[in-house]
Design a protein with these regions (language model features):
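Short, surface-exposed polybasic-aromatic patches that bind anionic ligands, especially phosphate groups
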Residues: 1-173
Length: 175
């Protein structure tokens, strides 16, 4: 996808970096999405940076993430790979932050790049742009709101020791 670069007065490809953070508790990599596209970060001259992972309390953002990359698969959207869904989700999030619909900001690519033909770029780009537009509209118009998870478990009786497949377990019933 290309967008108009006001500073240079020309169309330029949107470069999307897959960004993740390392969870300090479990050491796992988790995808991260910047919801402030004007800020500097990965892809703007920095190899890496330390930041505070925070929850962004905006239901529009939650709806885009939940319906997009964090809550579905690229196959469900008829996309070609996981990267395409990540890109569509990121474009939708940036569009929410900037207040402009993806189809009003972006055009399909007009130049070959990285060995890909214009036809290939346009074919895949159209799919990504359509999904980004759908996610954007869902973010704005969806009715779901984020609620904190809540579990109400009441212990029933006392715990027991049980041998299951030659292993000793402590078991407890809950209701």
């Amino acid at each position: 996808l290309e967008y108009w670069m006001e500073d240079y007065q020309k169309w330029s490809y949107k470069i999307i970096w897959y960004v993740y953070y390392l969870d300090k508790d479990d050491g796992q990599k988790y995808p991260a999405f910047c919801v402030q596209p004007a800020r500097k970060g990965v892809g703007t001259g920095y190899e890496s940076y330390d930041g505070t992972v925070t929850k962004f309390g905006d239901d529009r953002v939650w709806r885009v993430l939940n319906k997009g990359y964090m809550g579905s698969t690229y196959k469900e959207w008829n996309l070609e790979c996981d990267d395409d869904l990540y890109s569509a989700t990121k474009v939708a999030l940036h569009s929410i932050a900037e207040g402009i619909a993806p189809k009003d900001k972006y055009i399909l690519g007009t130049r070959s790049v990285d060995g890909n033909t214009v036809e290939e770029i346009r074919r895949r780009g159209e799919k990504v742009l359509n999904v980004a537009q759908s996610l954007y509209e869902y973010g704005l118009n969806g009715q779901e709101v984020y609620t904190l998870p809540f579990v109400n478990a009441i212990r029933k009786g006392e715990h027991k020791e049980e041998v299951i497949e030659n292993n000793l377990y402590y078991t407890q019933e809950y209701q």
